[in-house]
Amino acid sequence: MLGRRSVSLLRGLTELPVSSRAHTALRALSVPQTRRNVATKPNYEGHIPLNWFENALLTAGAAYMSITDPRRGDMVAALGETTAGPTVSWLRDQMLASPEGRQILKDRPRITSSTVDMDKLAQMPEGTFGRAYINWLERCGVTPDTREPVHYIDDPELAYVMQRYRECHDFYHCICNMPVNVESELAVKYFEFANLGLPMAGLAALFGPLRLNAQKRNWLFTEAVPWALKCGSSARSLITVYWEKRWEEQVEDMKKEFGIWDGPEARWSKPLNEAKEAAERRSKTTQNQIY
């Protein structure tokens, strides 16, 4: 059983931001710094090395918070990293086996509003992937700038693979025509688990439905899950897709190439607020260009 100090630490774990927690609470319970292995030095910017006990404690705390409060994106991200295990290496190997994937690992592109020309995508013809992505962002009210950076994967290349998965998640929603409400998010998690095999996606798919009412749970298991498992398992591994090179391609052509088809009709909720200002800025920019 955990001692009193460990219980206190676990309580603090659920209340502090990830970076703050890792530098304070987790360190307090670890082996004295003088006895720690030199391998605990950061391997890349933002890396937070953990020993086995810190990793286990973070996993337990992040799992608890991810279930009780799925809005804690930092905890969901931390759990994804601490449970990734050999799956991330397997995904890296898939990328290395693909010309497109190898180019991604060589270039290491990032997907944010500062690296992607959103104004250019908004001016692309309807039916192109770039225009579909912008339409999806605005319809859902989200931005690509809310993804947590990777902290707890030691190998820099594997850390990038996890970051790549994280930043491409919205593309999966977009190409599968899925919104971001809870039941649709879970459908995409089932798809990701079948397609990529990440344990975190499986955990979310397992425990997430507990938060749904009967009607939404029925839609998930009778319509969405069968589609997600069949489509995800038969489609090309999406971690190998260089999405940024495909903005001008037709979405329907990409679906055929990847072996993807639309999921069941989903419930589109009111857009979230995080992308409202971004959409307004793009609108003003377009008007200025016209006048």
Swiss-Prot record:
Function, in words: Lyase that catalyzes the C1-decarboxylation of 4-hydroxy-3-methoxy-5-(all-trans-polyprenyl)benzoic acid into 2-methoxy-6-(all-trans-polyprenyl)phenol during ubiquinone biosynthesis.
Keyword Zinc-finger among record annotations: no
Subcellular location: Mitochondrion inner membrane
Name under which the protein is recorded: Ubiquinone biosynthesis protein COQ4, mitochondrial
GO biological process, one term: ubiquinone biosynthetic process
Organism domain of life: Eukaryota
Composition-biased stretches (Basic and acidic residues): 271-283
Subunit structure: Component of a multi-subunit COQ enzyme complex, composed of at least COQ3, COQ4, COQ5, COQ6, COQ7 and COQ9.
Enzyme class: lyase
Main location (coarse class): mitochondrion
Keyword line: Lyase, Membrane, Metal-binding, Mitochondrion, Mitochondrion inner membrane, Transit peptide, Ubiquinone biosynthesis, Zinc
Catalyzed reactions: a 4-hydroxy-3-methoxy-5-(all-trans-polyprenyl)benzoate + H(+) = a 2-methoxy-6-(all-trans-polyprenyl)phenol + CO2
GO cellular component entries: extrinsic component of mitochondrial inner membrane
Membrane topology designation: Peripheral membrane protein
Cofactor: Zn(2+)
Pathway participation: Cofactor biosynthesis; ubiquinone biosynthesis
Region (Disordered) residue spans: 271-291
Keyword match Membrane: yes
